[in-house]
Swiss-Prot record:
Catalytic activity from the UniProt record: tRNA(Phe) + L-phenylalanine + ATP = L-phenylalanyl-tRNA(Phe) + AMP + diphosphate + H(+)
SUPFAM superfamilies attached to this UniProt entry: Class II aaRS and biotin synthetases, tRNA-binding arm
Annotated protein name in UniProt: Phenylalanine--tRNA ligase alpha subunit
Taxonomic lineage from the root: Bacteria, Pseudomonadati, Pseudomonadota, Alphaproteobacteria, Hyphomicrobiales
Family statement: Belongs to the class-II aminoacyl-tRNA synthetase family. Phe-tRNA synthetase alpha subunit type 1 subfamily.
Pfam families, A to Z: Phe_tRNA-synt_N, tRNA-synt_2d
Classification via PANTHER family: PHENYLALANINE--TRNA LIGASE, MITOCHONDRIAL, PHENYLALANYL-TRNA SYNTHETASE
GO molecular function annotations of the record: ATP binding; magnesium ion binding; phenylalanine-tRNA ligase activity; tRNA binding
Name of the coding gene: pheS
Co-factor remark: Binds 2 magnesium ions per tetramer.
Gene Ontology CC annotations of this record: cytoplasm
Amino acid sequence: MSDIERLEQEICLALEMAGDEQALEAVRIAALGKKGSISEKLKALGKMSASERQKVGPVLNGLKNRVLELWTQKRDFLRRQAMDACLTRETVDITLPVRSSPIERGRIHPISQVIEEIIAIYMKMGFSLAEGPDIETDYYNFTALNFPEGHPAREMHDTFFFDVNKTGERKLLRTHTSPVQIRTMEKQKAPIRIIIPGKTYRMDSDATHSPMFHQVEGLVIDKTSTIAHMMWLHETFCKAFFEVSSVKMRFRPSFFPFTEPSMEVDIQCDRSGSEVKFGEGQDWLEILGCGMVHPHVLKNVGLDPDEYQGFAWGMGIDRIAMLKYGMPDLRAFFDADLRWLDHYGFRCFDMHAFFPGLRNV
């Protein structure tokens, strides 16, 4: 056995015996450091004849490369071993036993479920999600949206106003999520395609109204969008949300300060039985309001209405949740009654998809 072969065996044995990175580094230095065994032999090549260098040089370089490869493999092995030991030592079991009683299991609230369904449908159509503050200024909630000074929505009996602050400004709880449309158009260049789900507040309370309710609005701004695009969008949404293959819709003229022309949309349904069935029947049910964005609104955010156009719409999330899942009283949504939630809520671990209420999305 030659000296080089014997040296390789010694180094390989030392690498195998190294139990930690510190010992492994010592082996590397002993073999490949400035005064290491392999380094010394490489230095000795200069004293050899040309023929000897041609013979011994490749052998030594091959040994050096093999030792480096073995050293790297052992280092990676030791690091993985140390990480596994650390994870085993620091593991904390955060699981809990499954509760046996059905009423004790957590439920996803129908409002949360419906919001996720709405987001899933619109995001599949290329929309992004936008959010804004619940506490708004008069400008963003009314003025920028073309509400005139004497509009009833500006009155104390319809809107929750805060006291006038030191600067003379009176803030309010937003009455719709439309202020987010203004904020988005101020910050983002066209084209814009957003949906805005969120809480809104109005002084109203009965079986179908609540002082706090959930609303989703949408906005499309570009240079080519028309009423035809808006009608197709609403039809596509209703078919996906109510899980029907076809649906008839009726667009009725209406008035909203921030759109012109404005429309209210009815969807054909059957209300003859105990539940509402969509895609059939001879009844009509109002589902949302919409229209082309008013030129004054575009001007308020610095857009030229001769160049840009678009449409906006809004619908009550609580209302369409009641329609889809057969809930008779809106007030029960906010009573924190576990019996109601056990009946109408969604079990997290019984779901077969991220959005189980949508078979067609």
